[in-house]
Regions:
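Hydrophobic alpha-helical transmembrane segments
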Residues: 20-25, 46, 50, 74, ...
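Interfacial helix-loop-helix linkers and transmembrane-helix boundary segments
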Residues: 37-43, 61-71, 86-104, 244-247, ...
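Structural signature of multi-pass alpha-helical membrane transport proteins
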Residues: 2-3, 10, 14-69, 77, ...
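Alpha-helical membrane segments and immediately flanking helix-loop junctions
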Residues: 119, 123-172, 340-385
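Transmembrane helix-loop junctions at the membrane interface of multipass transporters and ion channels
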Residues: 61-65, 89-90, 122-124, 142-165, ...
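Juxtamembrane and boundary regions of transmembrane helices in multi-pass small-molecule transporters
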Residues: 3-5, 9, 112-127, 166-211, ...
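Alpha-helical membrane-inserting segments
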Residues: 29-33, 37, 51, 55, ...
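Entry/N-cap segments of selected transmembrane alpha helices
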Residues: 90-117, 171, 305-333, 382-384
């Protein structure tokens, strides 16, 4: 930790200092690039990921243990904020269209698994390798961990490393692929954003916070309930759920806090413990943005070198990953739009939630008008079930390879 790894103009930085510096540079440059629009379209905060990959590919030495902690903590902050923002209206929205959206999520997962198996057979690829590409294409780190544990239990030589390589090569373009899927859905269905309903804006304006609520103190944010939610969420996410396979399924560090935050956001407002000024205040919004920025920077800085190395030897995995990423959500959301007539902002959130992909939700929130929570609702409605299914199917692909 005390070894000096990086210097600028005779200033030397330890690996910890280098890591923090690279995180700051990744976020700073990524946010600047995110303001660039081409024909009104921008990748937004997703640029942070690619700046991080670029810096890592240049050989900047970061502390990977530190990156892992920062990445996970950023993700926890992000999903906690999303859960609090969506919570007050989540269960009402779930009753309206939650069942249909979760069935869509189930179909989306099944299509992804089916395409993965077909590619493995047609391209003569090992299914264990494709399981790694699958987890990267759906941006699901817990699924990768579950698959690695499964191959470890089965004693498959070298499979864990190949799983990680497949994940690393598919993940970066998966983030872009899901955003492109959102744009293609808009193009296919000729959606005019100016005419797209944003019901949540009106409902929020008619549901103002009570002035004497405890949440109005200190700028509308109380840290105590937030960290209680995080603590309870981590406990919930660590509870093993037996499903009759080699390893139990867990909601993980993202799924657990999200579920607890949803309940806390709904129950807290309903019981009058705090108002929507707390759950949707500037403090929670900033928590969400800081969380996603830390997460993307951590992922990029940690994956850059592995991404470049794997692309050089397994470049077709990139193509396979893009197919697994984009085909299922495009087909499912076209059905959701053309048959079920679901809102476009909700469907963008659905794409992110059904792939457990926070950057897609960040993009959707950037596209949606200020005050519209439909992307958050679509994301949170399908995320818990999707997380379970993604972890389960990652292990299933490994077991199918035996």
């Amino acid at each position: 930790m005390d070894n000096y790894q990086f210097s600028i103009l005779n200033f030397q930085f330890s690996t910890v200092g280098t890591t923090v510096l690279m995180l700051a540079i990744s976020i700073f440059l990524g946010l600047l690039l995110g303001k660039i629009k081409i024909k009104g379209i921008t990748l937004g905060i997703t640029w942070v990921l690619f700046v991080g990959i670029g810096l890592s590919a240049l050989g900047v030495a970061c502390n990977h243990d530190m990156l892992h902690i920062i990445k996970e903590f950023g993700l926890i902050l992000f999903v906690t904020a999303v859960g609090l923002q969506v919570g007050p209206g989540f269960f009402r929205s779930f009753k309206k269209g939650g069942l249909a959206m979760n069935i869509m999520a189930l179909v989306n997962v099944a299509l992804g698994v089916g395409i993965t198996v077909i590619i493995a057979k047609m391209a003569n690829q090992e299914l264990t390798d494709m399981a790694g590409v699958y987890t990267g294409a759906i941006t699901n780190t817990p699924g990768l961990s579950a698959a690695q544990q499964a191959v470890g239990d089965l004693g498959i030589e070298g499979a864990s490393e190949r799983l990680a390589a497949g994940y690393a090569v598919a993940y970066p373009l998966a983030v872009v692929g899901m955003i492109v899927s959102c744009l293609l859905l808009r193009w296919f269905c000729r959606i005019d954003l100016k005419k797209e309903p944003t019901e949540e804006i009106q409902s929020n304006q008619n549901n103002q916070s009570t002035p004497n609520s405890t949440s109005s103190k200190k700028g509308g944010i109380l840290l105590i309930p937030i960290f209680i939610i995080i603590a309870l969420g981590i406990v919930l996410g660590s509870i093993p759920i037996p499903v009759g396979m080699k390893a139990p399924v867990k909601l993980g560090l993202a799924g657990g806090p999200l579920v607890v935050a949803l309940i806390a956001g709904w129950l807290g407002v309903k019981k009058g413990w705090y108002s929507t000024e707390f759950t949707d205040g500037q403090g929670v919004h900033m928590l969400r943005e800081v969380g996603i920025a830390l997460f993307l920077a951590g992922v990029g800085l940690g994956a850059g070198q592995a991404f470049v190395a794997t692309v050089q030897t397994h470049y077709m995995w990139v193509v396979y990953g893009v197919i697994i990423t984009m085909v299922p959500p495009i087909l499912v959301t076209l059905f959701g739009r053309l048959v079920l007539h679901l809102n476009y902002y909700t469907l963008m959130g659905f794409i992110g939630g059904s792939h457990t992909d926070p950057p897609t939700l960040a993009f959707a929130n950037n596209v949606a008008p200020e005050g519209c929570k439909l992307p958050n609702t679509g994301y949170a409605t399908v995320y818990p079930l999707t997380m379970f299914l993604r972890i389960f199917t990652a292990q299933l692909l490994v077991l199918m390879a035996i």
